[in-house]
Every structure is written in C-alpha cells, then in structure tokens.
C-alpha cells in the first residue's frame, strides 16, 4: 500500500523485518521442541537463540540466486548460527513457516483493526447520544419519507460496526492457526508436539488437519469480513456525502483553518474525506474475490495463492486500518446543523405526515384503498405547488376525520416516540 494511505503500526506488520522476525521465532521455537524430544542437541537449540540473526539485504541477495525466499532466509541464518544451523528446519517444509507466519501477521493486523473499531464505536455512540432527539428527515429512494432523528441514523451505523467487530473477532480466531506438519501434512518427519509447542509460543491454535498448507477457507472468511467492514465504512461515508450536498447541508465534514476545497473555486467545502473512504472501501473489497479463489488449490498445494496474498493481505489490512481511523476522526468532528434539518422537515408542507393521515382515515372506517386515494390526491397537489397539505385535507369532503384529530396527525413527535426504546434495545444488547 502506498504511504499516503498507510499508518506506521499496521504497515510495520508487513515489513520484511517483521516477517523474518516471525520466521526466526518459528524456527527457534521448533528447535526448542525438537531438543526437548531428543531429536536435536539442546546446545543446537540454544545456539539458534544466542547467535541467530538475519539481514534483509543479505536475504534478498541470496534469493536472487536461489529464487526461494525461505531457503534464502535459512542460508542467512546459518551464516550467523554456524555449525548448529544444520539442525534448523528439521522435518519442516517452507509452508510450515510461511503459513504460520501469515497467521501471526493476520492476527496482529486484526488486533489493530479491533482497536480501530473500538475508537469508531465510541465516537458513533457519543454522537448518537448527543443527537438522540435531534429531528431530521428519513429518506427512501433519496426522497423525503418520514421524520427520524439524527441520533437514530448514527445508532444504526453504530450497531452495524458492533456486528462487524464481532465478525472480526470470529475471523481472527479462525485464521490464527499454526501448521508445522511437514511436506504434505502427515507429520511423517516431525512430531506433532513441535507444532503444539510453536502454536502455544506464538499464541495460535493448532491446525487440526493441513495439507502442505493451512486451508484457505480460513483466509477467505477473514478477508470477506474485511470486505463487509469496508462496505459499512462506505455506507456511513455515503450518508455524510449526501447530507453535505449544498441543497441539503444537514451535516458536513470539519473544514480546518487554511484548508482549501478547490484550485479554481475558493468557496468550495467538499466532502473529500467521505469520498476518499468510498474509494478505499473499493480497495479493501478487491481482496475478497481473490481470497475466495485461493480456496481451490491443486491437491496438497500449489503456489497460485502465494503471489495474490502477498499483494492483497498488506493492501487490504493497511487500507482498512487507515479508513477506520479516518472515519473515526470524521465522526468525532462532524458538523451537524439541526436548523437545516428542521427546515428540510418543513420543506414539503407536511407531506411527511401522510401515513398518519392514512391511518387516521382507516381507523375512522374508510377502506384502505379509498383512504390511500384520498390522501394521495391532496399530496399530489402539494407536489405541484397547489396548496398546503393540511388545508387541502380539511377542505376535502371525503376526509371524515375531525380537524383536531387531523391536526394531531401532523405532530412530529408521533414519529419519534420510540426513540428511547430503540436506543435502550441497542445499547442494552451491547452490555449483555
């Protein structure tokens, strides 16, 4: 991922130094287990820890000749360890190192993403509570529908990201497995106790059954989860973009002193963060299909999955980490305009209360189809600019509801009377 959309801690997970450090730990812990089993001398295992080291540049140099990254690493490691290096990697295959390392890296990435989600959830909850009773328009198909509150809008996104957090916890647990089982997963040349020891030291579970590789359905579920989270990011970003339209302007991104929106038009205040998040969501989702396609490999293994994972695993996790942090900051500083929300509520002259009128007529004994036609007749006149909705209804002889009851249909509070109950349902579920 390019530096522009990278944060240091997540990017560091995918740097060669971290990858080779994990490789070293896998090999060194495996030596400890082999020594405990009497397969290699204890002094050899100690030598690996004491003298073991690596240089990224040297590994790259060796790989240019060997065309094999794990062999290049082991060769460089042997240059430091010396004679005892012949006991390193006993009974193991390259995928034992590669796949176990990837499990560690994906676990590390998930931990950062979970922290990102916690910050975002805290921001959404705080802003939702702040605007719990701030009335605003609910829209369907982009058209005014009925009143809701801005707090409810944000609460819906909060609930989605809470579900996403639960999904990511499950995906992390599923992908965090260690496989050190030899050439085709049969443990023919290595004791399963070695796998158990390395898994414990690295904080992983053992892979119950592997081939030469850890089954890629685990990784597919992980990246599918990242794709869902990215779609939730885009969903909220898209809402903010729509609300910041000049014709709407119910909310907008914070515009910092000295910030500029256009090289040509000094007046512009553009939703650039939300637009950026929409784009980054596409980058993250781009990993989902390749991850699914990696599930099907030839027999006990081929390397068709390897090149793709080396690209999309860093890119997807780094991009999502950046996006979640940016979205949290956006929510924390989001500018909200209740006056504009109220003005938009009143813009259509009461049409947003049409369902209340429909229900009042049916309660008064009018058939639903007939009631719908009566209400729609007046509503279409309002759309055409031919009058006020309430006045037109009062003047309609087919509207049999008393004026006081009709006026009550236009009470905005009737639409939001269950807000407290909805908040309690969402937030109490969190506590339980």
Where are these regions (language model features)?
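Catalytic-core signal marking the mid-to-C-terminal active-site face
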Residues: 1-18, 72, 263-432
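Generic, well-ordered alpha-helical scaffold segments in large soluble proteins
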Residues: 33, 76, 80, 123, ...
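Short amphipathic alpha-helical segments with heptad-repeat character
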Residues: 107-118, 125, 155-158, 162, ...
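Conserved hydrophobic residue
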Residues: 40, 45, 248-249, 367
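Glycine-rich anion/phosphate-binding loop at the beta-strand->alpha-helix junction
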Residues: 164, 212-305
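Short, well-ordered beta-strand elements within core beta-sheets of diverse protein domains
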Residues: 152, 220-228, 356-364
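Active-site-adjacent "gating/activation" loops or surface patches in catalytic cores
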Residues: 195-212, 216
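A helix-coil-helix interface module used to build multimeric assemblies
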Residues: 1-187, 191-197, 206, 259-262, ...
